[in-house]
């Protein structure tokens, strides 16, 4: 893989990670409600889920999800239901302003697992990776090394972007002056979770 080819993938991966989705929403809500340490656990979970998708694509299972309507539909509806459930939970969240107290309500391990599930139940992610990776793989060169390069690049880029979203969320949290504003923010993010869940439910198999 040439540097130019890798740089083209880097730009593509960056644009994709910057696109707001369930991962970004999950990172921002976790950062606001559970502090930066909670966000770190969430980001680690997202990258774990992404890494699993990359491995599945590498061993050929990504093609199964891209070709099997049943597999796509099962994962799609599981993901949509989970995101809508997260949105409902966010709507019901207390409007407390003390982030240090909120950070104790869920362990970082639980936030980590939640983030893994958010990424794993997104069939569009694995289908897109299955379609994208081959476009940047040079058949005349060792494929395993190229998959590793693309996979590591994807994870590092997404980690940096999600860290940016977490930092932005922390700045938003600093503007919150009382419980009413926190509750309104929880409802806003809860609505976004449900919207993304609804959009995922309406997604059609290519």
Curated annotation (Swiss-Prot):
PANTHER family named in the record: ARGININE EXPORTER PROTEIN ARGO, HOMOSERINE_HOMOSERINE LACTONE EFFLUX PROTEIN
GO molecular function, one term: homoserine transmembrane transporter activity
Protein family: Belongs to the Rht family.
A GO cellular component annotation in the UniProt record: plasma membrane
One Pfam family hit: LysE
GO biological process, one term: homoserine transport
The protein's name: Homoserine/homoserine lactone efflux protein
Main location: membrane
Record membrane topology: Multi-pass membrane protein
Subcellular location, record wording: Cell membrane
Transmembrane annotation, as ranges: 5-25, 45-65, 68-88, 117-137, 148-168, 182-202
NCBIfam families (alphabetical): 2A76, PRK10520.1
Role summary: Conducts the efflux of homoserine and homoserine lactone.
Keyword field: Cell membrane, Membrane, Transmembrane, Transmembrane helix, Transport
SS bond list: none
InterPro entries named among the record's database cross-references: Homoserine/Threonine_efflux, LeuE-type
């Amino acid at each position: 893989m040439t540097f130019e080819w890798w740089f083209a993938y880097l730009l593509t991966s960056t644009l994709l990670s910057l696109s707001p989705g369930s991962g970004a929403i999950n990172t921002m809500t976790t950062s606001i409600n559970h502090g930066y340490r909670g966000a770190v656990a969430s980001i680690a979970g997202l990258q774990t889920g992404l890494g699993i998708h990359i491995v599945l694509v590498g061993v050929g299972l990504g093609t199964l999800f891209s070709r099997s309507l049943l597999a796509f539909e099962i994962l799609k509806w599981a993901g949509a239901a989970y995101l809508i459930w997260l949105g409902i939970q966010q709507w019901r969240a207390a409007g407390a302003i003390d982030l240090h107290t909120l950070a104790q309500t869920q362990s970082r391990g639980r936030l980590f697992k939640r983030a893994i599930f958010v990424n794993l139940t997104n069939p569009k992610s694995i289908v897109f990776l299955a379609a994208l990776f081959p476009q940047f793989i040079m058949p005349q060169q060792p494929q395993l090394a190229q998959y590793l390069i693309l996979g590591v690049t994807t994870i590092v880029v997404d980690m940096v972007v999600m860290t940016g979203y977490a930092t932005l969320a922390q700045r938003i949290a600093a503007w919150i002056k009382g419980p009413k504003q926190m509750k309104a923010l929880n409802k806003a993010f809860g609505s976004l979770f449900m919207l993304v869940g609804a959009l995922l439910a309406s997604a059609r198999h290519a």
